[in-house]
From Swiss-Prot:
One Gene Ontology cellular component annotation held by this UniProt entry: cytoplasm
Family label: Belongs to the class-II aminoacyl-tRNA synthetase family. Type-1 seryl-tRNA synthetase subfamily.
Pathway field: Aminoacyl-tRNA biosynthesis; selenocysteinyl-tRNA(Sec) biosynthesis; L-seryl-tRNA(Sec) from L-serine and tRNA(Sec): step 1/1
GO MF, one annotated term: ATP binding
Gene name per UniProt: serS
Quaternary context: Homodimer. The tRNA molecule binds across the dimer.
Matching Gene3D superfamilies: Bira Bifunctional Protein, Domain 2, Serine-tRNA synthetase, tRNA binding domain
Subcellular localization, as worded in the UniProt entry: Cytoplasm
Annotated binding of ATP, by residue: 257-259, 344-347
Highest taxon above the source species: Bacteria
UniProt protein name: Serine--tRNA ligase
Pfam families to which the protein is assigned, alphabetical: Seryl_tRNA_N, tRNA-synt_2b
Source lineage: Bacteria, Pseudomonadati, Campylobacterota, Epsilonproteobacteria, Campylobacterales
Record note on domains: Consists of two distinct domains, a catalytic core and a N-terminal extension that is involved in tRNA binding.
This enzyme's EC code(s): 6.1.1.11
Length: 411
């Protein structure tokens, strides 16, 4: 959640940045009106309170005590009424603020959508073939690794069953990713896949993205769309010791998304599924640590791809493509020869204090004052998409898949 004081004191500047992130101008106009009303009603409340303080002190020496008592009693009622007005405005402001995204960093390019993201660099050269490479779903069906028909039968569309060496390769990737991330200093944690509404709110999924979440009927429980949600909220409502920061964690989980806005996109294969697996990086830092930890996380995910021999590129997301909670995001896109293009396989984001304010995660700074932490998250990596990348990049003309050397010990 945004700092409402900063929003009020620097409204025009912040509003301009939020417009770049596609915040509705009517919402910004409503906020401006609420801030003006709140200022007016607070001023009136302060005047009533000042009257009460001044004349309460004079009551003992007043000549007409009964008259003054009556005035003070009447003024107290006005204070109660005015306090209710102020509280109602503050609650309305906070409710609107819950649905307003984070402010983009200064380094984030202004743009409308993914077409205006900025390529930062390419890592490794794409694979070359002396034959036309197949897409992963063709390979998966011919090798009996991917069973889409039975996945749909037991669930619905956008579900798949992994079988035989495909399932083994997926398991090997999970173990390798966890080991790789741990070697970079990230502590492995295992968390529930079902979390409560407060946890969903803390990282920004609720209330804005409620329609894309799977909820358990009659219970305050949601299936997670990423392990960023439970891992970040492990420290919700806590005040951390300065010397414990940064906290760097990695976690494997299944992820569940309705993909409400993805009709017609990636309908074949396992690129976009309602259930998929991911190994995540999550960090909690002091404000002055978050930029360097962001670079560590990005390097970890990129080096992991390189260790698998997968060509990829770094993209800085523009304001129009930036996620709700993120102040800055760099995507990693892996080369898929079957599709003849790069596809997203990781997003690394710095959320600054946006999630920490919602989840109430603080630390005691060097001056002994409680200060909001910064939170960061990133995929290292999306398991299914890494499986896709290996299948397409390591195929031969007979349709067989060769296993990267670093994974062989996991079979």
């Amino acid at each position: 959640m945004l700092d409402l004081k900063n929003l009020q004191n620097n409204f025009d500047e912040v509003a301009k940045k939020l417009k770049n992130k596609k915040v509705d101008e009517n919402i910004l106009k409503k906020l401006a009106e609420l801030f003006a009303s709140l200022k007016k009603e607070k001023t009136a409340l302060e005047e009533f309170q000042a009257f009460q303080n001044k004349f309460s002190k004079e009551l003992a020496t007043a000549e007409d005590k009964e008259s003054l008592k009556a005035k003070l009693s009447e003024n107290k009622s006005k204070i109660n009424e005015q306090s209710a007005k102020v509280n109602a405005l503050e609650n309305e402001l906070e409710e609107i603020a819950h649905a307003i995204p984070n402010i983009p960093d200064e380094c984030v390019p202004v743009g409308e959508d993914e077409d205006e993201n900025v390529e930062l660099k390419k890592v490794l050269n794409p694979s070359s073939f002396d034959f036309t490479p197949k897409e992963h779903f063709e390979l998966g069906e011919s090798l009996n690794w991917l069973d889409f028909v039975r996945g749909v039968k037991i669930s619905q569309s956008r579900f798949c069953v992994l079988k035989n060496e495909g399932a083994l390769l997926s398991r090997a990737l999970v173990n390798y990713m966890i080991d790789f991330n741990r070697s970079r200093g990230f502590e492995f944690v295992n968390v529930p896949f079902l979390v409560n509404g407060a946890t969903m709110f803390g990282t920004g999924q609720l209330p804005k993205f409620k329609e894309d979440m799977y909820k358990v009927d009659d219970e305050d429980l949601y299936l997670i769309s990423t392990s960023e949600i439970p891992v970040t909220n492990l420290y919700s409502g806590e005040i951390l010791a300065s010397e414990t920061l940064p906290i760097k964690m990695t976690c494997y989980s299944a992820c569940f998304r309705k993909e409400a806005g993805s009709a017609g996109r990636d309908t074949r294969g396992i690129i976009r599924q309602h259930q998929f697996e991911k190994v995540e990086l999550v960090s909690i830092t002091k404000p002055e640590q978050s930029d360097s930890v962001f670079n560590e996380m990005l390097e970890c995910a990129s080096d992991l791809l390189s260790s698998l021999g997968l060509a990829h590129r770094h993209l800085m997301l523009c304001t129009g493509d930036l996620g709700f909670s993120a102040a800055k995001t760099v995507d990693l896109e892996v080369w898929l020869p079957g599709q003849n293009k790069y596809r997203e396989i990781s997003s690394v984001s710095n959320c600054r204090d946006f999630q920490a304010r919602r989840a109430k995660i603080r630390y005691k700074n060097e001056q002994g004052k409680n200060e909001l932490v910064h939170t960061l998250n990133g995929s290292s990596l999306a398991v299914g998409r890494t499986l896709v990348a290996i299948m397409e990049n390591y195929q031969d003309k007979e349709g067989k898949i060769h296993i990267p050397d670093v994974l062989k010990k996991y079979f």
